[in-house]
């Protein structure tokens, strides 16, 4: 492809000029082949500028950098381009390379601490019911229509993201609904993407290992609402008003407690779902979701608001939500087809607010004791660990503290951090996660409910020196046969 086309709309200067055509773009020097363009990105673990020579040796004919490269004479017959921000440059060039695909599909972005995944699945169900072909990008998997593609992170890097958009355009997708993480906003992965709608679910503590302060975390989320045509905002959340003031374009507020444009009333909750009246202007529909929890009413409202802005009738929205299957690893009752006398629920809750939501939801339909099994991830926000300990212990009859994804940290030390927040004497420590689930199932009695929180849909566990297969749903079904 012609280099000038790739550089369109980008501010840059030539340090060395030679090559005018490139094969493809890469930011990983190991993937560079003859004729490629390599972008030097400064990361948190390493700096791509250190690998410029490696990329050149592998065949790079164009190198884009934001820092001065040493020993320019080394790069014979190579074009070197200087930019002020390599990440923004990667996003712009990736979009140009793939033909600016985000201009050819309607993109709906969902951000917030909790609820993003469920909301994207709700949106997909509604839009498909309305007759559209839909793509989905998120934590569990990526979808182009019915085609499922493995997902490696909530929001892909800009190069992979633009490729997915291009694939959607090629497959004649009408809408893409996507989870937009705070990392992706801060790191410019979605820079230049034209969002038709942006949904704000909520904001609670998470990712402070990365953002350092809560204000930084919030400001990263705000970026989405400054780049969207329309915004759909949870006004019941304490940060909703701030988002409302900063958001551009048309806005719809939603909630249960406060006055808002789109409201849920007459809430009825039970073990297999929730029912509520949805009121928007002069319309009202009673909607019955087959997933429990008040927080899922909020997820539904955000999705409803965005779809109303897209002109989809409330009746169609109701039909789609009522027909929607459960989302993997989100309040998933693994034992519903077994007659055990107790239930085991798997949920992705890995933040204090997420854990509080799932335990409060489970408490609503627990006739016996509520038993929680959870831990905290290694190499992540340490400040939330004692809070997680306190929340889990206070809201459970029995809390079993265990490992999550310890990564490079010692699981015992992570558990120690969790225990610092526990004020009650109702906990057990079982370091091995499978053993912890077994313990919960062994002590469960008639009418008890076990909530296994933290991993949800994940089918792996990240240890210090390896990643192992670990699907809690499989583990639970195996233990049913063993116990």
Curated annotation (Swiss-Prot):
Cofactor(s) demanded: Mg(2+)
Chief localization: cytoplasm
A GO cellular component annotation in the UniProt record: cytoplasm
Binding site for meso-2,6-diaminopimelate: 380, 404-407, 454, 458
Residues modified to N6-carboxylysine: 221
Reaction equations catalysed: UDP-N-acetyl-alpha-D-muramoyl-L-alanyl-D-glutamate + meso-2,6-diaminopimelate + ATP = UDP-N-acetyl-alpha-D-muramoyl-L-alanyl-gamma-D-glutamyl-meso-2,6-diaminopimelate + ADP + phosphate + H(+)
Keywords: ATP-binding, Cell cycle, Cell division, Cell shape, Cell wall biogenesis/degradation, Cytoplasm, Ligase, Magnesium, Nucleotide-binding, Peptidoglycan synthesis
Annotated localization: Cytoplasm
Keyword match Nucleotide-binding: yes
Residues that bind UDP-N-acetyl-alpha-D-muramoyl-L-alanyl-D-glutamate: 29, 154-155, 181, 189
UniProt entry tagged with the keyword Cytoplasm: yes
Pfam families from the UniProt entry: Mur_ligase (PF01225), Mur_ligase_C (PF02875), Mur_ligase_M (PF08245)
Pathway: Cell wall biogenesis; peptidoglycan biosynthesis
Residues annotated as binding ATP: 112-118
Post-translational modification: Carboxylation is probably crucial for Mg(2+) binding and, consequently, for the gamma-phosphate positioning of ATP.
Domain of life per record: Bacteria
EC number: 6.3.2.13
InterPro entries referenced in this protein's UniProt entry, alphabetically: Mur-like_cat_sf (IPR036565), Mur_ligase_C (IPR004101), Mur_ligase_C_dom_sf (IPR036615), Mur_ligase_cen (IPR013221), Mur_ligase_N (IPR000713), MurE/MurF_N (IPR035911), UDP-N-AcMur-Glu-dNH2Pim_ligase (IPR005761)
GO molecular function per UniProt: ATP binding; magnesium ion binding; UDP-N-acetylmuramoylalanyl-D-glutamate-2,6-diaminopimelate ligase activity
Gene Ontology terms describing biological process: cell division; cell wall organization; peptidoglycan biosynthetic process; regulation of cell shape
Chain location of the short sequence motif Meso-diaminopimelate recognition motif per the record: 404-407
Its biological purpose: Catalyzes the addition of meso-diaminopimelic acid to the nucleotide precursor UDP-N-acetylmuramoyl-L-alanyl-D-glutamate (UMAG) in the biosynthesis of bacterial cell-wall peptidoglycan.
Homology family: Belongs to the MurCDEF family. MurE subfamily.
HAMAP family on file: MurE
Protein name stated in the entry: UDP-N-acetylmuramoyl-L-alanyl-D-glutamate--2,6-diaminopimelate ligase
């Amino acid at each position: 492809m012609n280099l000038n086309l790739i550089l369109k709309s980008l501010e840059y200067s030539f340090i060395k000029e030679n090559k005018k055509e490139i094969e493809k773009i890469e930011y990983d020097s190991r993937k560079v082949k003859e004729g490629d363009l390599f972008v030097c990105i400064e990361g948190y673990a390493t700096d791509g500028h250190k690998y410029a020579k490696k990329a050149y040796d592998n065949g790079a004919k164009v190198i884009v950098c934001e820092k001065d490269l040493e020993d320019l004479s080394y790069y014979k017959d190579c074009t070197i381009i200087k930019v002020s921000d390599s990440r923004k440059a990667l996003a712009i060039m990736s979009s140009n390379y793939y033909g600016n695909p985000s201009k050819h599909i309607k993109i709906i972005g969902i951000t917030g601490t909790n609820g993003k995944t469920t909301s994207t699945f709700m949106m997909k169900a509604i839009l498909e019911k309305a007759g559209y072909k839909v793509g989905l990008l998120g934590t569990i998997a990526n979808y182009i229509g019915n085609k499922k593609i493995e997902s490696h992170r909530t929001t892909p890097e800009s190069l992979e993201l633009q490729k997915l958009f291009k694939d959607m355009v090629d497959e004649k997708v009408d809408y893409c609904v996507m989870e937009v993480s705070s990392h992706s906003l801060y790191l410019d992965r979605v820079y230049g993407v034209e969002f038709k709608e942006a949904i704000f679910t909520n904001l609670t503590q998470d990712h402070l290992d990365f953002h350092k302060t809560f204000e930084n975390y919030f400001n990263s989320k705000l970026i989405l609402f400054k780049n969207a045509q329309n915004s759909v905002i949870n006004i019941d959340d304490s940060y909703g008003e701030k988002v409302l003031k900063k958001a551009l374009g048309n806005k719809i507020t939603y909630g249960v407690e406060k006055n808002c444009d789109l409201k849920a009333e007459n809430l009825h909750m039970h073990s297999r779902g929730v029912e509520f009246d949805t009121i928007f202007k002069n319309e009202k529909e009673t909607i019955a979701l087959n997933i429990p929890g008040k927080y899922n009413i909020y997820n539904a409202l955000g999705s409803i608001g965005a779809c109303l802005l897209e002109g989809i009738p409330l009746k169609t929205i109701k039909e789609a939500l009522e027909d929607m299957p459960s989302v993997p690893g989100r309040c998933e009752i693994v034992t519903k087809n077994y007659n055990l006398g107790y239930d085991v629920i798997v949920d992705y809750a890995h933040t204090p607010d997420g854990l509080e939501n799932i335990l409060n939801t489970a408490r609503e339909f627990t006739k016996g004791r509520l038993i929680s099994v959870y831990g905290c991830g290694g190499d992540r926000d340490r400040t939330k660990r004692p809070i997680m300990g306190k929340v889990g212990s206070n809201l459970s009859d029995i809390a079993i503290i265990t490992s999550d994804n310890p990564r490079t940290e010692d699981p015992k030390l992570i558990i120690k951090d969790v225990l610092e927040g526990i004020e009650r004497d109702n906990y057990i420590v079982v370091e091995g996660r499978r053993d912890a689930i077994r313990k919960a199932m062994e002590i469960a009695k008639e009418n008890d409910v076990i909530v296994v929180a933290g991993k949800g849909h994940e089918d792996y566990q990240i240890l210090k020196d390896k990643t192992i297969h670990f699907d809690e749903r499989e583990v639970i079904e195996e233990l049913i046969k063993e116990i």
